[in-house]
Design a protein with these regions (language model features):
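Nucleotide donor/acceptor-binding cores
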Residues: 58-60, 118
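Conserved Class I S-adenosyl-L-methionine
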Residues: 191-278
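Conserved catalytic/acceptor-binding region of the Class I
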Residues: 142, 146-214
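A short beta-strand submotif of the Rossmann-like class I SAM-dependent methyltransferase core
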Residues: 125-126, 134
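Class I SAM-dependent methyltransferase SAM/SAH-binding core
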Residues: 60-62, 67-112
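Conserved class I S-adenosyl-L-methionine
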Residues: 2-56
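A short, conserved alpha-helix within the catalytic core of class I
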Residues: 132-140
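A short acidic, Gly/Pro-enriched loop at the edge of an enzyme's catalytic core
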Residues: 113-122
Length: 278
């Protein structure tokens, strides 16, 4: 199951989510930094090579909605400097501070006054673009990008499991949680398939996957980092939803006879386009 089977139920998603309350809790930001999947080297290489088609000298990248810097640090080997920007102070506090060409700032994707116009080779957003004011973010990207600069939006689908019994339960779990997703996540559930970047010649890459074997506890740790779990717990404080998920996963694994862990796969998508040359 990718996110696709849930897309028809997007109308169940919430219209009453206070985005300002998201990722302000240090425990959740630490869980995000520790338990979210790390992007593969193939993703960073794919985007960097696309950038070099029009700007071979990769001087500056900006990673907006960077969270604790999981994608920012992946681009560091390709660019002379990269700046990670996130609106959450706790996410930025969890970013690494020992990479010489990485800088992290608290800020909004649509307001980057500390970046000079026409100086950026790559403006990117990983697993966060759906949270942003899109038209304003595109306008700010256009301001800071060099002619020929690249805009890249990427992310991953909901995880799938290789054990049928586990996969069946995961679908039930996501259906239970979908009312706790904000409406701005609708396109993310559809892998941004209808998203149009502001430049001509947009390309899409759906060929990269990320797989990792997880125990039940490791999967629970991943779920702890997600917003729907936080929202569900806030509205249903009497329930132990993570404990329930753990019990159901353990039972599914026991029923399958497949051992104590399972293979989890995230399908990655990338959208890229070049700003036209002058």
């Amino acid at each position: 199951m990718s996110s696709e089977p849930l897309f028809p139920f997007a109308h169940l998603m919430s219209n009453n989510v206070d985005k300002s309350a998201m990722f302000v809790d240090m425990d959740q930001s630490k869980a995000y930094a520790d338990c979210r999947p790390s992007y593969t080297e193939e993703l960073f290489k794919t985007i960097a090579e696309y950038c070099q088609e029009t700007n071979p000298d990769l001087s500056l990248a900006v990673d907006v909605g960077c969270g604790p810097g999981m994608s920012t640090i992946g681009f560091a080997k390709y660019f002379k400097k990269i700046i990670g920007v996130d609106i959450s102070k706790t996410q930025i506090a969890c970013a690494p501070n020992n990479i010489s060409n990485c800088e992290f700032r608290v800020g909004s994707a649509d307001k980057l006054p500390f970046i000079t116009s026409g100086t950026v080779d790559l403006f990117c957003s990983g697993q966060s673009f759906h949270w942003m004011p899109q038209n304003e973010t595109f306008a700010e990207a256009d301001r800071v990008l060099k002619p020929g600069g690249t805009i890249a939006i990427f992310g991953y689908d909901l995880p799938t499991a290789d054990v049928p019994e586990v996969q069946s339960y995961l679908h039930e779990m996501w259906m239970k949680l979908i009312p706790f997703y904000p409406q701005c996540c609708v396109q993310a559930l559809h892998s941004l398939r209808s998203e149009e970047l502001p430049y001509p010649g947009q390309i899409r890459n759906d060929e990269i996957t990320l797989s990792k074997r997880l125990t039940v506890q490791q999967f629970i740790d991943f779920m702890q980092s997600t917003w729907p779990i936080r929202a569900y717990k806030s509205e249903n404080p009497e329930e132990n939803i993570l404990g329930d998920i753990a019990n159901q996963l353990s039972e599914a694994l026991k029923k399958s006879g497949s051992g104590s862990d399972f293979l989890v796969t995230w399908n990655i998508y990338i959208l890229m386009a070049h700003k036209p040359m002058l």
